[in-house]
Amino acid sequence: VPLDLPDAILAHSDGGHVLLVDCLTLWATNLMLGERDAEAATDALCMAIRRFDGHLILVANEVGLGIVPDNALARAFRDVAGRMNQRVAAVAGEVMFIAAGLPLRLK
């Protein structure tokens, strides 16, 4: 997953593409390890999602369903990934949660 994911998405926005991004959680990891501003990057991602002309499929992991992590880095990651997922879901036309191969339509 490239760090400049929004630009990569928009590079394929021509109405004829189906684009699969797997996975946003790995992108969030790379942003944190690269000491990038995850909030600003998520802003750019949401703008790219709104501007994309085609069929865009985004995959992310849900990392907030377990116990509270015992270390600061893991808690920060959980929070960054959770905020990113919420913001992406807000601009997405459809949101599915998949567990054990079973889809649950959230939006």
What are the roles of these predicted feature ranges?
Residues 1-44:
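Conserved inter-motif catalytic segment of the P-loop NTP-binding fold
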